[in-house]
Amino acid sequence: MAMQKLFTYIYEFIEYRKMVLLEEKVPYDKFVQMVLNTGFFRINAETLNHGIVSVFIFGANGKYVHHGGDMRTLLTNTLNEKKHYEELILIVDKPVLSKKNILDIIVEQRAANPTIVINIYPYHLFCINIPKVSAIPKHKLITQEEAQEFLGREYLQPQDLMQISASDPPVVWLGGRPGDFVQIERPSETAMHAVVIRFITKSKI
């Protein structure tokens, strides 16, 4: 069931982020076959800035999520492809996020590739279309100029704002990064919507 949802919503995620697929969408049965046979399924897409984003969906029992060496080789080979990578998104079963050997590889690769965003997330962030969940208020990234205008008007510094983690589901779907600002519209008793600004901080993983 998780794989079916992942297959559906990962493409909606790519569309929501306004990315363009660099390969044709494969049928679901081929997606499953690749996850089972190779241990992962990869999607390449291009951002509005013409950067490349590679999304890896790893099988729960494949070698890449159990052996740090295999994960290191995969990521190193990927980043050596000489493409203009902007981001790698690794999607794994939640228990993998507690495996030190895998997390150490992520830290290592981030240090070796400081200009590339490398993130690892659990399946459940992509088993639903987060922006369409009615219980979640609308989130929107704002520019640094818009944020500075707000801060100046309110006589605030970024550290004075409430914070939101880069791993928060709506922020993940938006592609927000530490140092960015997000505008959140919440229902209000005195107005149709109350608008708040949050400062995005680094996630724990």
From Swiss-Prot:
Return the GO cellular component terms, semicolon-separated: DNA-directed RNA polymerase complex; host cell cytoplasm; virion component
**GO BP field:** transcription by RNA polymerase II; transcription elongation by RNA polymerase I; tRNA transcription by RNA polymerase III; viral transcription
Superkingdom, natural source: Viruses
* UniProt key word Cell division: no
- Disulfide bonding pattern of the chain: none
Alphabetized GO MF terms: DNA binding; DNA-directed RNA polymerase activity
InterPro entries named in the record: Arch_Rpo5/euc_Rpb5, RNA_pol_subH/Rpb5_C, RPB5-like_sf
From the Swiss-Prot or TrEMBL record, state where the protein is found: Host cytoplasm; Virion
What keywords does the record list, in alphabetical order?
DNA-directed RNA polymerase, Host cytoplasm, Transcription, Viral transcription, Virion
Q: Which Pfam families match?
A: RNA_pol_Rpb5_C (PF01191)
Q: In which broad location class does this protein mainly occur, judging by the first location in its UniProt entry?
A: host cell
Report the family membership: Belongs to the archaeal RpoH/eukaryotic RPB5 RNA polymerase subunit family.
Task: Give the multimer and partner information.
Answer: Part of the viral DNA-directed RNA polymerase that consists of 8 polII-like subunits (RPB1, RPB2, RPB3, RPB5, RPB6, RPB7, RPB9, RPB10), a capping enzyme and a termination factor.
Question: What role does it play?
Answer: Component of the DNA-directed RNA polymerase (RNAP) that catalyzes the transcription in the cytoplasm of viral DNA into RNA using the four ribonucleoside triphosphates as substrates.
Q: What is this protein called?
A: DNA-directed RNA polymerase RPB5 homolog
What organism is listed for this UniProt entry? Answer: African swine fever virus (strain Badajoz 1971 Vero-adapted) (Ba71V)
